[in-house]
A protein has these predicted regions:
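C-terminal amphipathic alpha-helical interaction region
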Residues: 1-100
Length: 100
């Protein structure tokens, strides 16, 4: 399900204008990283559970649980940001940064 969500979001981003895609690029990279690492942790926990080392399996599962509960929720914020248009980013004129 996580990989499918990432794929569907990637298809949405692919359809963006170049400006909107560029505006969300950093959030897309963070979103992708968190999602794909989540998939890897699910896979590692599953592989370890099928092995013959219960201590390793418990450690992998606990680390996977930590990732899911503490880090994976960050995807929601990055996804929300990357799906926004570049309007607020482009609304600031160059001279509006002149503070001197």
């Amino acid at each position: 399900a996580l990989l499918d969500e990432w794929y569907q979001t990637s298809l949405q981003v692919k359809a963006f204008s170049p400006v909107d895609a560029a505006a969300g690029a950093c959030d897309y990279l963070a979103y992708s990283g968190y999602c794909l690492l989540g998939v890897l942790w699910y896979s590692m926990a599953d592989c370890a559970a099928q092995g013959d080392n219960p201590v390793l399996a418990a450690g992998k599962q606990k680390t996977c649980d930590f990732y899911i509960q503490r880090l994976l929720p960050r995807t929601a914020a990055h996804k929300a940001a990357l799906l926004e248009s570049a309007d607020t980013l482009l609304a600031i004129a160059g001279n509006e940064f002149d503070y001197l």
